[in-house]
UniProtKB/Swiss-Prot annotation:
Record organism: Candida albicans (strain SC5314 / ATCC MYA-2876)
Taxon lineage: Eukaryota, Fungi, Dikarya, Ascomycota, Saccharomycotina
Name under which the protein is recorded: Zinc cluster transcription factor CZF1
Comp. bias intervals (Basic residues): 265-275
Compositional bias of kind Basic and acidic residues: 348-364
Quaternary context: Interacts with EFG1.
Gene name per UniProt: CZF1
Length: 385
């Protein structure tokens, strides 16, 4: 039996459906609504031209913004959404408006975070206004007015500082004069007022000292005799000894501590240590602490050179065989163990190079049959009887 298709009497096509539409069931949409991807079909039998069923769709989209066929992007406040293939604007709901406002707030916050904080310190006063840029004559006038004021302020500060320094120096000079009463105080602010040499200044200071002696009434006695030698040693050390008389120099030398006492306080440097070592080495030559020290000491005394680890000399046999020698005389332990001839160099010739003839004589032996022949002593060893 063939199934009778359900005829929808509200269909604008008057029930004329194709077989392809029956095989593919589609969701039933409300009447007078076109599918989202299809164009609006005009209704037949209508008066006043074709009518598009988009007014109802726009109303439904305003109620439910998630309907199929809506704009795929959020609408801004200054934009108007239009339905696809229609000329009707889409009405935005309150939810979309609130979402747009939130997006604007977020974008403003991000811009504020990205902007660096340039005004970290309070704004400082500027010497010119913005309008002065367009009036260079006025700007030059302002600058000319500011320069003397700045110079005047600097002069005032320098004068105030100079007065403070002078007052402090005057107080110090008063204290020094009260303690010494005879020693002329040096001017620390301007020691060489007329750019004179120190020698000329010293010559000028000499009459001042003579005047102070005459004023105190102690011409015959030397300087500082009236005070009873109550002047501190620091001031006495500052006095140049060239300007003093011979009697004054002797008195200053007696009051100053002796140089050997200062030498004992200081730590000894390297130079005194080296001197002590050289003196001790010249008095007693260094002898290595070995078993052969007693045997090797006479050679050192005869040669006049101190024996060290580098300058030790063994027997000639050990030197030829390139072995370590214990330097025991008359026979070393190595030669006695191997029963070799332990020969020692002549006194005074330990550190001298051997002549060529002597080397040839040492390397040759008298043979009974062959006579005088050369021998390689490093390889062939002849045992003594």
């Amino acid at each position: 039996m063939s199934s009778i298709p359900n005829i929808n009497w509200n269909d604008p096509n008057n029930g004329k459906s194709n077989t392809s539409r029956q095989s593919q069931p589609q969701p039933q949409l409300p009447s007078n609504v076109s599918p989202p991807n299809s164009r609006a079909v005009p209704t037949s039998g209508s008066i006043g031209g074709p009518q598009y069923g988009s007014s109802q769709f726009s109303n439904e989209y305003s109620r439910n913004p998630n309907t199929i066929g809506g704009p795929p992007f959020p609408l801004q406040s200054n934009q108007r959404g239009y339905m696809p293939n229609t000329g009707y604007p889409v009405q935005q709901t309150a939810q979309q408006r609130s979402g747009d406002k939130l997006q604007q707030v977020h974008s403003q916050q991000q811009q504020q975070q990205q902007q660096p904080l340039y005004q970290q310190y309070p704004p400082q006063s500027v010497g010119y206004l913005a309008g002065d840029v367009y009036n260079p004559q006025h700007q030059e006038y302002v600058q000319m007015n500011q320069l003397p004021n700045q110079h005047y302020n600097l002069q005032q500060r320098q004068q105030a500082q100079g007065q403070q320094l002078k007052s402090q120096l005057n107080e110090q000079n008063a204290m020094m004069s009260a303690s010494t009463q005879q020693y002329p105080v040096q001017d620390f602010t301007n020691p060489y007022p007329n750019a004179q040499n120190p020698a000329e200044q010293q010559q000028q200071q000499q009459p001042l000292r003579t005047q102070s002696q005459q004023w105190d009434g102690y011409q015959s006695q030397p300087l500082y005799s009236a005070a009873g030698n109550t002047i501190p040693s620091s001031i006495q050390q500052q006095i140049p000894p060239q300007n003093l008389s011979p009697s004054e120099q002797q008195q200053v030398k007696q009051q100053q501590p002796s140089p050997p006492e200062q030498g004992t306080k200081k730590k000894p440097g390297r130079k005194p240590k080296l001197r002590k070592l050289s003196e001790s080495s010249s008095e007693t030559p260094q002898v290595p602490k070995t078993a052969s020290s007693s045997s090797s000491s006479p050679t050192a005394v005869n040669s006049g050179k101190p024996i060290t680890k580098r300058s030790r000399m063994g027997c000639l046999t050990c030197r030829q065989r390139k072995k370590r020698c214990c330097e025991t005389r008359p026979r070393c332990t190595e030669c006695t163990r191997l029963r070799l001839n332990c020969t020692w160099p002549k006194p005074g010739t330990e550190h001298k190079n051997k002549p060529k003839d002597q080397k040839d004589d040492e390397n040759t032996i008298e043979h009974a049959e062959f006579g005088r022949i050369k021998v390689l002593r490093g390889i062939v060893e002849y045992r003594s009887k």
